[in-house]
Amino acid sequence: MRPRFFVVYLIAALVIAVDQWTKQWAASTIPPLIGYTVIPGFFDLVNVRNRGAAFGFLNRSDIEWQFWLFFAAAVTAVLAIIAMTRSAKSNPYLFTGFGLIMGGAIGNLIDRIRFRAVIDFLDFHIGGYHWPAFNVADMGICVGAFFVCLAVYKHK
């Protein structure tokens, strides 16, 4: 296996493992829709199911097509990352980003297949502002996108 694939797959595997472990922990420890306050007025641990995308986008129970949309998006992202990893020049920022995005996409895809929804459990809020609950896979996707942008910026 070429080193670039090893790096991408190793990072993806780590994200998937941490994501699935933390979701299992949250689902078995935190009462659904109740949660625990960790830092009053700022951070709670919750146990919610999100049928939509990251941060609650399209989280509606009255539409079924979003399962297939997000399923197809995750599979397409993984296949695109594999293809781009083959053709990309060596760039640690790019390969780190690819691994994080791939791991996040697969982590959430596992939930979609198992539960038809994604387990979200990290809930941040301050004052009247509330950020939608999210999970480790969502963080992988967002941080991975940052690394890909950084790779593009550094390449110029």
UniProtKB/Swiss-Prot annotation:
The keyword Hydrolase applies. The active site is at residues 120, 138. Keywords: Aspartyl protease, Cell inner membrane, Cell membrane, Hydrolase, Membrane, Protease, Transmembrane, Transmembrane helix. It catalyses: Release of signal peptides from bacterial membrane prolipoproteins. Hydrolyzes -Xaa-Yaa-Zaa-|-(S,diacylglyceryl)Cys-, in which Xaa is hydrophobic (preferably Leu), and Yaa (Ala or Ser) and Zaa (Gly or Ala) have small, neutral side chains. Pathway: Protein modification; lipoprotein biosynthesis (signal peptide cleavage). The chain crosses the membrane at residues 5-25, 63-83, 90-110, 133-153. Its main location: membrane. One of its GO terms (biological process) is proteolysis. One of its GO terms (cellular component) is plasma membrane. This protein specifically catalyzes the removal of signal peptides from prolipoproteins. It is a multi-pass membrane protein. This is Lipoprotein signal peptidase. It is found in: Cell inner membrane. Its EC number is 3.4.23.36. The lineage of its organism: Bacteria, Pseudomonadati, Thermodesulfobacteriota, Desulfovibrionia, Desulfovibrionales. HAMAP family: LspA (MF_00161). Belongs to the peptidase A8 family. The gene is lspA. It comes from Oleidesulfovibrio alaskensis (strain ATCC BAA-1058 / DSM 17464 / G20). It is an enzyme of class 3 (hydrolase).
